[in-house]
Amino acid sequence: MIYQVTALVILAVFYGCYFLKMLMQQRKGIRTDQIGQGKVGFVKFVEVTMKIATLLVPAAEVISILLNTTCFWAPFRICGAVIGALGATVFVTSVVTMRDSWRAGVSKTDKTELVADGIYQISRNPAFLGFDLVYIGILLMFFNPWLLIASVFAMLMFHLQIVNVEEDFLLETFGQEYLAYKKKVNRYIGRK
């Protein structure tokens, strides 16, 4: 029962932050969810598939938590709880640091700034890192084949979004400023 409660708290903090930030930005007239909007070809495919994956994972997570599925011993589950809590913390920190520049997907029409301070000094993609850590944490706590497939698929789609959509957008939008930042900070974690 303790693992189930812990996992539900992690998910409540994680998804609560996501939806609260979207609501706060909506009140300012900012449309946060840009996934697939105005996109064509491979970019649209990546963004729409990523969105589907991010809808499948929470469903698989909640079902796994409610059924208390796992084949792992307690140390793995405890490690999963720590990783999941770290992921939620990283995600919340990234969203707060981004201020009003945070978007789900990219928008070529919104005026945003390149955020390179705070947690962005050690990760160019801390929000995606937070997603990955939460997914890995919950997976370790409630391992089952369906959750594994959904989580790995979503993490793969996040990576494709970063590499094929976001990095190109940031280079096009911020040019040399982004290149200088990219030379200093790793995609997921660490400085160069």
Predicted segments, located by residue:
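Active-site-proximal inter-transmembrane loops
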Residues: 107-128
